Amino acid sequence: MNVSDLLNILNELLHPEYFSDYGPNGLQVGNAQTAIRKVAVAVTADLATIEKAIACEANVLLVHHGIFWKGMPYSITGILYQRMQRLMEGNIQLIAYHLPLDAHTTIGNNWKVARDLGWEQLESFGSSQPSLGVKGVFPEMEVHDFISQLSAYYQTPVLAKALGGKKRVSSAALISGGAYREISEAKNQQVDCFITGNFDEPAWSLAHELAIHFLAFGHTATEKVGPKALAQYLKGAGLESVVFLDTDNPF
């Protein structure tokens, strides 16, 4: 299998054409005709991850966060130069899929969590189109028990919480990554909790004034889910050597 074949698989699975994204989805650096030796899957194409990909002898790095974003300067200098230099020195083809991997209803960063935790009556959630997140219901429990359940799933303690809602909860909305502003939409949808990755100062007041729980588990932790699931998917799609590269990024 070559990189072009892999791109066909990924495009058919993730449908990037449906999304107006913040950066290019698909092959960002490399040659589409390269024969695949080993695929490394990760959250972000930072220098540490690129070095890990080189060390494990991968020649394809597939990530959620690539190295090109809208509004970047055209010049290739500084950190961007260093990353591209190591990619090319290691003969690594870089592939990235951003919003399509958030939104996928089976292996995405949001829907997979809801399915794994047994939420029911699942519906798309979020103000963007297509929607990136998911909402659902679950058996009523104490909010602190719900937080513990999520912490165990994400394998990290909650980084920020604003408990503005009721003591017992039975519904939630989830958008991974930097979606704290969607708390207002969560209230509009009448769920008990809103879960995301990042947090910022307004979230505290909004949670209490809207009478909803706000829970943030970190951008990285909430966006490992999709890449891990994608790695497993590719193993079943004919790729013999696929690894997930973890990171110790707590943000």
From Swiss-Prot:
One GO MF term: metal ion binding
GO cellular component: cytoplasm
Binding site for a divalent metal cation 2: H65, H219, E223
Keyword rRNA processing: no
InterPro entries registered for this protein in UniProt: DUF34/NIF3, DUF34/NIF3_sf
Transmembrane among keywords: no
Annotated a divalent metal cation 1 binding sites: H64, D102, E223
Gene3D superfamilies in UniProt: NIF3 (NGG1p interacting factor 3)-like (3.40.1390.30)
Organism superkingdom: Bacteria
Keywords linked to the UniProt accession: Metal-binding
Family listed: Belongs to the GTP cyclohydrolase I type 2/NIF3 family.
Self-association and partners: Homohexamer.
Descriptive protein name: GTP cyclohydrolase 1 type 2 homolog
Protein's organism: Chlamydia trachomatis serovar D (strain ATCC VR-885 / DSM 19411 / UW-3/Cx)
Lineage: Bacteria, Pseudomonadati, Chlamydiota, Chlamydiia, Chlamydiales
